[in-house]
Amino acid sequence: MRDKVSGARRWVVKIGSALLTADGRGLDQAAMAVWVDQMVALRAAGVELVLVSSGAVAAGMSRLGWASRPKAVHELQAAAAVGQMGLIRAWESSFARCDQQTAQILVTHDDLSDRKRYLNARSTLRTLIDLGVVPVINENDTVVTDEIRFGDNDTLAALVANLVEADLLVILTDRDGMFDADPRHNPEANLISEARADDPALDAVAGGTGGALGRGGMQTKLRAARLAARSGAHTVIVGGRIEQVLSRLKAGERLGTLLAPECNRHAARKQWLAGHLQTRGTLTLDEGAVLALRQGNRSLLPVGVRAVQGAFRRGEMVVCVGPQGAEVARGLVNYSAAEAQRILGRPSDEIEKLLGYVDEPELIHRDNMILV
Protein backbone atom coordinates (compact mmCIF):
# COMPACT_ATOMS: atom_id res chain seq x y z
CA MET A 1 0.00 0.00 0.00
CA ARG A 2 2.95 2.37 0.40
CA ASP A 3 2.98 3.04 -3.31
CA LYS A 4 -0.26 4.94 -2.67
CA VAL A 5 1.83 7.42 -0.67
CA SER A 6 4.85 7.80 -2.93
CA GLY A 7 2.65 7.93 -6.02
CA ALA A 8 0.06 10.35 -4.66
CA ARG A 9 -0.26 13.44 -6.84
CA ARG A 10 -2.28 15.74 -4.56
CA TRP A 11 -1.39 16.00 -0.86
CA VAL A 12 -3.05 17.78 2.03
CA VAL A 13 -0.49 18.23 4.81
CA LYS A 14 -1.65 19.13 8.31
CA ILE A 15 0.96 20.40 10.78
CA GLY A 16 0.02 20.64 14.45
CA SER A 17 0.78 23.45 16.89
CA ALA A 18 3.43 21.52 18.80
CA LEU A 19 5.52 21.19 15.63
CA LEU A 20 5.42 24.90 14.83
CA THR A 21 6.15 26.46 18.20
CA ALA A 22 9.27 26.57 20.34
CA ASP A 23 7.97 24.91 23.51
CA GLY A 24 5.20 27.48 23.77
CA ARG A 25 7.53 30.44 23.27
CA GLY A 26 6.12 31.55 19.95
CA LEU A 27 6.59 30.30 16.41
CA ASP A 28 9.72 28.29 15.68
CA GLN A 29 10.95 29.99 12.51
CA ALA A 30 13.75 27.47 11.99
CA ALA A 31 11.33 24.53 12.20
CA MET A 32 8.95 26.23 9.77
CA ALA A 33 11.83 26.73 7.32
CA VAL A 34 12.58 23.00 7.43
CA TRP A 35 8.94 22.21 6.68
CA VAL A 36 8.96 24.67 3.80
CA ASP A 37 12.09 23.12 2.30
CA GLN A 38 10.41 19.72 2.31
CA MET A 39 7.16 21.02 0.83
CA VAL A 40 9.00 22.92 -1.90
CA ALA A 41 10.86 19.68 -2.72
CA LEU A 42 7.49 17.93 -3.02
CA ARG A 43 6.29 20.65 -5.38
CA ALA A 44 9.44 20.21 -7.48
CA ALA A 45 8.64 16.48 -7.68
CA GLY A 46 5.24 17.26 -9.17
CA VAL A 47 3.11 17.06 -6.01
CA GLU A 48 0.14 19.42 -5.74
CA LEU A 49 0.11 20.63 -2.16
CA VAL A 50 -2.36 22.15 0.30
CA LEU A 51 -1.15 23.06 3.80
CA VAL A 52 -3.48 23.05 6.80
CA SER A 53 -1.63 24.87 9.54
CA SER A 54 -2.41 25.01 13.22
CA GLY A 55 -0.57 27.43 15.45
CA ALA A 56 -2.57 30.68 15.48
CA VAL A 57 -3.81 30.33 19.06
CA ALA A 58 -0.42 29.08 20.27
CA ALA A 59 1.37 31.97 18.55
CA GLY A 60 -1.09 34.45 19.99
CA MET A 61 -0.66 33.04 23.49
CA SER A 62 3.06 33.65 23.23
CA ARG A 63 2.63 37.19 21.94
CA LEU A 64 0.21 37.96 24.75
CA GLY A 65 2.44 36.36 27.38
CA TRP A 66 -0.01 33.61 28.34
CA ALA A 67 1.62 30.44 29.66
CA SER A 68 -1.48 28.22 29.53
CA ARG A 69 -4.30 27.85 27.04
CA PRO A 70 -7.32 29.86 28.26
CA LYS A 71 -10.75 28.30 28.55
CA ALA A 72 -12.87 31.39 27.84
CA VAL A 73 -13.95 31.56 24.21
CA HIS A 74 -13.37 35.31 23.85
CA GLU A 75 -9.79 34.90 25.11
CA LEU A 76 -9.16 32.07 22.66
CA GLN A 77 -10.53 34.22 19.86
CA ALA A 78 -8.30 37.10 20.89
CA ALA A 79 -5.26 34.82 20.90
CA ALA A 80 -6.21 33.49 17.45
CA ALA A 81 -6.62 37.01 16.07
CA VAL A 82 -3.22 38.10 17.40
CA GLY A 83 -1.46 34.91 16.38
CA GLN A 84 -2.93 34.48 12.89
CA MET A 85 -1.11 37.54 11.59
CA GLY A 86 2.25 36.24 12.72
CA LEU A 87 1.51 32.71 11.55
CA ILE A 88 0.63 33.57 7.97
CA ARG A 89 3.44 36.12 7.73
CA ALA A 90 5.92 33.47 8.86
CA TRP A 91 4.67 30.99 6.25
CA GLU A 92 4.66 33.61 3.50
CA SER A 93 8.21 34.80 4.16
CA SER A 94 9.56 31.27 4.46
CA PHE A 95 7.94 30.11 1.22
CA ALA A 96 9.00 33.32 -0.54
CA ARG A 97 12.60 32.44 0.25
CA CYS A 98 12.09 29.50 -2.13
CA ASP A 99 10.13 31.56 -4.70
CA GLN A 100 6.93 29.67 -3.87
CA GLN A 101 3.68 31.63 -3.94
CA THR A 102 1.19 31.05 -1.11
CA ALA A 103 -2.41 32.03 -0.39
CA GLN A 104 -4.16 32.42 2.95
CA ILE A 105 -7.59 30.85 3.36
CA LEU A 106 -9.52 30.99 6.63
CA VAL A 107 -12.57 28.74 6.81
CA THR A 108 -15.10 27.39 9.25
CA HIS A 109 -16.92 24.09 9.13
CA ASP A 110 -20.01 26.05 8.06
CA ASP A 111 -18.18 27.14 4.91
CA LEU A 112 -17.85 23.48 3.96
CA SER A 113 -21.36 22.40 4.97
CA ASP A 114 -23.24 25.02 2.92
CA ARG A 115 -23.34 23.66 -0.64
CA LYS A 116 -22.92 26.98 -2.44
CA ARG A 117 -20.03 28.09 -0.24
CA TYR A 118 -18.51 24.62 -0.55
CA LEU A 119 -18.53 24.85 -4.34
CA ASN A 120 -17.09 28.36 -4.28
CA ALA A 121 -14.30 27.24 -1.95
CA ARG A 122 -13.59 24.23 -4.17
CA SER A 123 -13.38 26.38 -7.29
CA THR A 124 -11.00 28.81 -5.59
CA LEU A 125 -8.75 26.05 -4.28
CA ARG A 126 -8.68 24.26 -7.64
CA THR A 127 -7.67 27.51 -9.33
CA LEU A 128 -4.90 28.14 -6.80
CA ILE A 129 -3.60 24.58 -7.24
CA ASP A 130 -3.69 24.93 -11.02
CA LEU A 131 -1.67 28.15 -10.68
CA GLY A 132 1.00 26.34 -8.67
CA VAL A 133 0.16 28.24 -5.48
CA VAL A 134 0.32 26.54 -2.07
CA PRO A 135 -2.89 27.38 -0.16
CA VAL A 136 -2.29 27.79 3.59
CA ILE A 137 -5.54 26.96 5.36
CA ASN A 138 -6.53 27.48 8.97
CA GLU A 139 -9.80 27.44 10.82
CA ASN A 140 -11.22 30.91 11.35
CA ASP A 141 -11.02 30.70 15.12
CA THR A 142 -11.66 34.43 15.51
CA VAL A 143 -15.33 34.24 14.49
CA VAL A 144 -16.43 30.74 15.52
CA THR A 145 -17.19 29.36 18.94
CA ASP A 146 -18.07 25.66 18.87
CA GLU A 147 -15.03 24.87 16.71
CA ILE A 148 -12.68 26.41 19.28
CA ARG A 149 -14.27 24.46 22.10
CA PHE A 150 -14.68 21.14 20.35
CA GLY A 151 -13.21 21.33 16.86
CA ASP A 152 -9.73 20.62 15.59
CA ASN A 153 -7.64 21.10 12.48
CA ASP A 154 -7.40 17.33 11.96
CA THR A 155 -11.08 17.32 11.04
CA LEU A 156 -10.64 20.46 8.96
CA ALA A 157 -7.75 18.85 7.07
CA ALA A 158 -9.93 15.83 6.26
CA LEU A 159 -12.71 18.10 5.00
CA VAL A 160 -10.18 19.95 2.86
CA ALA A 161 -8.90 16.62 1.52
CA ASN A 162 -12.46 15.81 0.45
CA LEU A 163 -12.92 19.31 -0.94
CA VAL A 164 -9.88 19.21 -3.23
CA GLU A 165 -10.19 15.47 -3.94
CA ALA A 166 -6.74 14.78 -2.52
CA ASP A 167 -5.04 11.45 -2.99
CA LEU A 168 -3.24 11.67 0.35
CA LEU A 169 -3.78 13.30 3.74
CA VAL A 170 -0.67 13.57 5.91
CA ILE A 171 -1.34 14.37 9.57
CA LEU A 172 1.89 15.34 11.31
CA THR A 173 1.88 14.92 15.04
CA ASP A 174 4.21 14.69 18.03
CA ARG A 175 3.88 10.88 18.05
CA ASP A 176 5.33 8.51 15.46
CA GLY A 177 1.92 7.16 14.48
CA MET A 178 -0.74 4.88 15.95
CA PHE A 179 0.38 2.14 18.34
CA ASP A 180 -1.35 -0.99 19.59
CA ALA A 181 -0.86 0.37 23.13
CA ASP A 182 0.12 3.72 24.64
CA PRO A 183 3.91 3.96 24.12
CA ARG A 184 4.15 6.54 26.90
CA HIS A 185 3.17 3.89 29.42
CA ASN A 186 3.94 0.59 27.68
CA PRO A 187 7.47 0.04 26.32
CA GLU A 188 6.20 -3.05 24.44
CA ALA A 189 3.82 -0.98 22.31
CA ASN A 190 4.17 -1.60 18.58
CA LEU A 191 3.62 0.86 15.76
CA ILE A 192 0.68 0.00 13.51
CA SER A 193 2.22 0.34 10.07
CA GLU A 194 -0.87 -0.20 7.91
CA ALA A 195 -4.57 -0.72 8.49
CA ARG A 196 -7.96 -0.06 6.99
CA ALA A 197 -9.35 3.25 8.18
CA ASP A 198 -12.67 1.61 9.04
CA ASP A 199 -11.10 -1.17 11.15
CA PRO A 200 -13.06 -1.09 14.47
CA ALA A 201 -10.03 -2.44 16.34
CA LEU A 202 -8.37 0.97 15.93
CA ASP A 203 -10.91 2.61 18.24
CA ALA A 204 -9.52 0.77 21.24
CA VAL A 205 -5.99 2.09 20.70
CA ALA A 206 -6.83 5.68 19.75
CA GLY A 207 -7.31 7.02 23.28
CA GLY A 208 -5.83 10.24 24.57
CA THR A 209 -6.27 13.94 23.93
CA GLY A 210 -4.15 16.77 22.62
CA GLY A 211 -1.51 18.70 24.50
CA ALA A 212 -1.60 22.14 26.08
CA LEU A 213 -1.07 24.00 22.80
CA GLY A 214 -3.18 21.81 20.52
CA ARG A 215 -6.60 20.25 20.83
CA GLY A 216 -6.57 17.10 18.72
CA GLY A 217 -5.56 13.72 20.14
CA MET A 218 -5.24 10.41 18.32
CA GLN A 219 -9.00 9.88 18.36
CA THR A 220 -9.52 13.01 16.28
CA LYS A 221 -6.82 11.86 13.87
CA LEU A 222 -8.54 8.51 13.40
CA ARG A 223 -11.87 10.25 12.81
CA ALA A 224 -10.16 12.52 10.30
CA ALA A 225 -8.70 9.52 8.45
CA ARG A 226 -12.14 7.92 8.27
CA LEU A 227 -13.64 11.14 6.97
CA ALA A 228 -10.95 11.44 4.30
CA ALA A 229 -11.49 7.78 3.37
CA ARG A 230 -15.07 8.57 2.35
CA SER A 231 -13.69 10.27 -0.75
CA GLY A 232 -11.07 7.59 -1.32
CA ALA A 233 -8.06 9.38 0.20
CA HIS A 234 -5.30 7.53 2.04
CA THR A 235 -4.11 9.00 5.34
CA VAL A 236 -0.68 8.83 6.97
CA ILE A 237 -0.47 9.70 10.67
CA VAL A 238 3.22 10.24 11.28
CA GLY A 239 5.67 11.85 13.67
CA GLY A 240 6.56 15.38 12.72
CA ARG A 241 9.87 15.17 14.55
CA ILE A 242 11.16 12.46 12.20
CA GLU A 243 13.92 14.05 10.14
CA GLN A 244 12.84 14.94 6.58
CA VAL A 245 9.62 13.02 7.12
CA LEU A 246 7.75 14.39 4.10
CA SER A 247 10.61 13.75 1.72
CA ARG A 248 11.03 10.24 3.08
CA LEU A 249 7.33 9.48 2.71
CA LYS A 250 7.55 10.59 -0.90
CA ALA A 251 10.55 8.28 -1.34
CA GLY A 252 8.43 5.34 -0.17
CA GLU A 253 9.73 4.79 3.36
CA ARG A 254 7.34 2.97 5.69
CA LEU A 255 6.95 5.73 8.26
CA GLY A 256 3.98 6.31 10.53
CA THR A 257 0.59 4.64 10.19
CA LEU A 258 -1.02 4.37 6.76
CA LEU A 259 -4.82 4.14 6.90
CA ALA A 260 -6.40 3.02 3.65
CA PRO A 261 -9.94 3.69 2.37
CA GLU A 262 -12.33 0.88 1.53
CA CYS A 263 -12.27 1.83 -2.15
CA ASN A 264 -10.39 4.17 -4.46
CA ARG A 265 -11.20 7.84 -4.87
CA HIS A 266 -13.16 7.44 -8.09
CA ALA A 267 -15.29 4.59 -6.74
CA ALA A 268 -15.88 6.42 -3.45
CA ARG A 269 -17.05 9.50 -5.33
CA LYS A 270 -19.48 7.46 -7.41
CA GLN A 271 -20.82 5.73 -4.29
CA TRP A 272 -21.40 9.11 -2.68
CA LEU A 273 -23.26 10.34 -5.75
CA ALA A 274 -25.33 7.18 -5.94
CA GLY A 275 -26.50 7.81 -2.38
CA HIS A 276 -28.17 11.07 -3.43
CA LEU A 277 -31.71 9.80 -3.96
CA GLN A 278 -33.42 13.19 -4.15
CA THR A 279 -33.16 15.05 -7.45
CA ARG A 280 -34.14 18.67 -8.05
CA GLY A 281 -34.64 18.88 -11.79
CA THR A 282 -34.27 17.35 -15.23
CA LEU A 283 -32.07 18.11 -18.22
CA THR A 284 -33.20 16.80 -21.61
CA LEU A 285 -30.25 15.96 -23.86
CA ASP A 286 -29.89 15.57 -27.60
CA GLU A 287 -28.69 12.29 -29.13
CA GLY A 288 -25.13 13.55 -29.51
CA ALA A 289 -24.85 14.35 -25.82
CA VAL A 290 -26.33 10.97 -24.86
CA LEU A 291 -23.77 9.21 -27.04
CA ALA A 292 -20.91 11.29 -25.61
CA LEU A 293 -21.88 10.40 -22.05
CA ARG A 294 -22.41 6.70 -22.69
CA GLN A 295 -19.45 5.99 -24.95
CA GLY A 296 -16.96 8.77 -24.40
CA ASN A 297 -16.95 9.26 -20.62
CA ARG A 298 -17.46 12.96 -21.29
CA SER A 299 -18.73 15.84 -19.20
CA LEU A 300 -22.12 17.31 -20.08
CA LEU A 301 -21.75 20.60 -21.95
CA PRO A 302 -24.54 23.18 -22.38
CA VAL A 303 -24.51 22.70 -26.16
CA GLY A 304 -25.96 19.19 -25.74
CA VAL A 305 -28.94 20.24 -23.59
CA ARG A 306 -32.32 20.89 -25.21
CA ALA A 307 -34.60 21.57 -22.23
CA VAL A 308 -34.44 22.36 -18.51
CA GLN A 309 -37.09 21.48 -15.93
CA GLY A 310 -37.21 22.15 -12.20
CA ALA A 311 -35.99 24.84 -9.82
CA PHE A 312 -32.54 23.57 -8.86
CA ARG A 313 -29.57 25.49 -7.53
CA ARG A 314 -25.90 25.11 -8.31
CA GLY A 315 -24.51 21.93 -6.75
CA GLU A 316 -27.84 20.07 -6.57
CA MET A 317 -28.57 16.69 -8.14
CA VAL A 318 -30.40 16.60 -11.46
CA VAL A 319 -31.52 13.82 -13.80
CA CYS A 320 -30.34 13.70 -17.42
CA VAL A 321 -32.75 12.13 -19.91
CA GLY A 322 -32.55 11.43 -23.62
CA PRO A 323 -34.90 12.79 -26.32
CA GLN A 324 -37.45 10.04 -25.55
CA GLY A 325 -37.39 10.67 -21.79
CA ALA A 326 -35.29 7.65 -20.76
CA GLU A 327 -32.88 8.39 -17.91
CA VAL A 328 -29.25 8.43 -19.01
CA ALA A 329 -27.38 9.83 -16.02
CA ARG A 330 -27.62 11.99 -12.95
CA GLY A 331 -25.15 14.38 -11.43
CA LEU A 332 -24.35 17.59 -9.59
CA VAL A 333 -25.04 20.59 -11.78
CA ASN A 334 -22.66 23.57 -11.99
CA TYR A 335 -25.35 26.16 -12.74
CA SER A 336 -28.81 26.98 -11.40
CA ALA A 337 -31.95 26.24 -13.40
CA ALA A 338 -32.28 29.88 -14.43
CA GLU A 339 -28.66 29.98 -15.58
CA ALA A 340 -29.00 26.65 -17.39
CA GLN A 341 -32.01 27.98 -19.30
CA ARG A 342 -29.93 30.88 -20.61
CA ILE A 343 -26.98 28.77 -21.80
CA LEU A 344 -28.66 25.57 -23.03
CA GLY A 345 -27.79 24.65 -26.60
CA ARG A 346 -24.89 27.09 -26.66
CA PRO A 347 -21.14 26.36 -26.79
CA SER A 348 -19.16 26.75 -23.57
CA ASP A 349 -17.12 29.67 -24.87
CA GLU A 350 -20.33 31.75 -24.93
CA ILE A 351 -21.18 31.22 -21.24
CA GLU A 352 -19.42 34.37 -20.07
CA LYS A 353 -21.12 36.48 -22.75
CA LEU A 354 -24.54 35.07 -21.84
CA LEU A 355 -24.23 35.19 -18.04
CA GLY A 356 -21.56 37.82 -17.49
CA TYR A 357 -19.37 35.24 -15.74
CA VAL A 358 -18.31 31.62 -16.03
CA ASP A 359 -17.99 29.16 -13.13
CA GLU A 360 -17.25 26.01 -15.13
CA PRO A 361 -17.26 25.19 -18.87
CA GLU A 362 -19.54 22.18 -18.34
CA LEU A 363 -23.03 21.84 -16.89
CA ILE A 364 -22.05 18.61 -15.14
CA HIS A 365 -18.46 17.42 -14.83
CA ARG A 366 -17.93 13.72 -15.50
CA ASP A 367 -16.46 13.28 -11.99
CA ASN A 368 -19.78 14.48 -10.56
CA MET A 369 -21.93 12.19 -12.70
CA ILE A 370 -23.08 8.58 -12.62
CA LEU A 371 -24.46 6.81 -15.68
CA VAL A 372 -27.70 4.88 -15.31
Swiss-Prot record:
PROSITE patterns, sorted: GLUTAMATE_5_KINASE, PUA
Binding site for substrate: S54, D141, N153
Keyword ATP-binding: yes
UniProt xrefs under InterPro entries: AceGlu_kinase-like_sf, Asp/Glu/Uridylate_kinase, G5K_ProB, Glu/AcGlu_kinase, Glu_5kinase, Glu_5kinase/COase_Synthase, Glutamate_5-kinase_CS, PUA
Domain of life: Bacteria
GO cellular component: cytosol
Compartments in which it is found: Cytoplasm
Family designation: Belongs to the glutamate 5-kinase family.
Listed name of the protein: Glutamate 5-kinase
Organism of origin: Stutzerimonas stutzeri (strain A1501)
Gene that this sequence comes from: proB
